[in-house]
């Protein structure tokens, strides 16, 4: 798979760069929206790799490589597809790093990338549905599917001695896919999901959603959402009302901005995100220096 991915990227670049001195790669992530604090590290991660390739002088007989940013917004499929169209038709990119969130990635792949024969490599679109989507050999990702994360999250919760959880998820492809994978794994292991309810991002008040979650009960609350919008709102409303005081945080909820916003009330909560403690990860931290946080979720996958 790794060799196929690299060959595909190289072929895409060659298609437009045989006689050119500069190859453009789109960095197509949610620079605004519900995971913008994560993308603040992911974008520079992707750009560091592009700059490294360009500086090597070894790509395409010395051709340079330039990163072109475009905003997926994470949640607005219309805005994302328009941005991807601009990358392809106006900026003339040869490949795309992205998208980030699963819904906009699916929409862009189907409506823009496939009709234009454009390669997309996502660092963070984790919906299980993307594993089997018809992609004409154009879509790859460097993060594992939520089919796996759901099992891992179930195992972690069980190991900590919890057997009953309430579950809320952001109402999109990412949230629904992760919630379904987790609920299936947790119930198969003998756990109880008291409620499996969606929430919308961008609301000012989540008291109704939290009221329903509290009424269903559960020892802890699993929040399969986004740390900069709905997920944060659910947690704050839960704390304000006393509905829950311990939260399980999957990858879309892991980042510095959440504890900065909530503070010590998050003490005791836990979660997980894909990553590695490999030698390569340590090397990336050195490469990043002070320019970005290479340990942030999906920064390494973006690189």
Give the location of each predicted region.
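Hydrophobic alpha-helical segments within soluble ligand-binding/sensing domains
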Residues: 80, 142-166, 177, 204-207, ...
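Gram-negative bacterial Sec-dependent N-terminal signal peptides
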Residues: 1-20
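Immediate post-signal peptide segment of exported/extracytoplasmic ligand-binding proteins
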Residues: 18-27, 58-66, 157-163
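Extracytoplasmic "Venus flytrap"
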Residues: 26-47, 70-77, 100, 168-176, ...
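Extracellular/periplasmic periplasmic-binding protein-like sensory domains
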Residues: 235-303
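Beta-alpha junction/loop-to-helix N-cap segments that form part of ligand/metal-binding clefts
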Residues: 37-44, 56-130, 142, 199-206, ...
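Extracytoplasmic ligand/sensor domains, especially the bilobed periplasmic-binding protein
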Residues: 89-197, 246-271
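Short, solvent-exposed loop/beta-turn-alpha elements that line the ligand-binding surface or hinge
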Residues: 57-61, 132-135, 279, 293
């Amino acid at each position: 798979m790794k060799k196929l991915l690299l060959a595909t990227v190289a072929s895409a670049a060659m298609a437009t760069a045989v006689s050119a001195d500069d190859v453009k790669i789109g960095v197509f992530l949610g620079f605004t929206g519900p995971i913008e604090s994560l993308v603040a590290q992911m974008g520079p991660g992707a750009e560091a790799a592009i700059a490294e390739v360009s500086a090597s002088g070894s790509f395409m007989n010395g051709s340079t490589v330039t990163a072109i940013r475009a905003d997926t917004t994470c949640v607005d499929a219309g805005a994302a597809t328009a941005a991807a169209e601009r990358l392809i038709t106006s900026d003339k990119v040869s490949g795309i790093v992205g998208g980030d969130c699963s819904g906009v990635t699916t929409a862009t792949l189907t409506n823009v990338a496939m009709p234009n024969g454009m390669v997309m490599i996502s660092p963070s679109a984790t919906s299980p549905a993307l594993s089997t989507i018809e992609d004409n050999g154009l879509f790859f990702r460097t993060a594992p599917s939520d089919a796996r994360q759901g099992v891992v999250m179930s195992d972690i919760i069980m190991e900590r001695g919890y057997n009953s959880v309430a579950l809320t998820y952001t109402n999109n492809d990412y949230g629904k896919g992760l919630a379904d994978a987790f609920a299936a794994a947790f119930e198969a292991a003998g756990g109880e999901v008291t409620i499996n309810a969606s929430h919308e991002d961008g609301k000012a008040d989540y008291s109704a959603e939290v009221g329903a979650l509290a009424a269903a009960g559960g020892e802890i609350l699993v929040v399969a959402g986004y740390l900069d919008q709905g997920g944060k709102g659910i947690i704050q409303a839960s704390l304000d009302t006393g509905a829950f005081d311990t939260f399980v945080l999957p990858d879309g909820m892991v980042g510095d901005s959440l504890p900065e916003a909530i503070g010590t009330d998050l003490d005791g909560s836990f979660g997980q995100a894909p990553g590695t403690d490999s030698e390569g990860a340590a090397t990336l931290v050195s490469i990043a220096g002070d320019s970005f946080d290479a340990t942030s979720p999906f920064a390494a996958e973006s690189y």
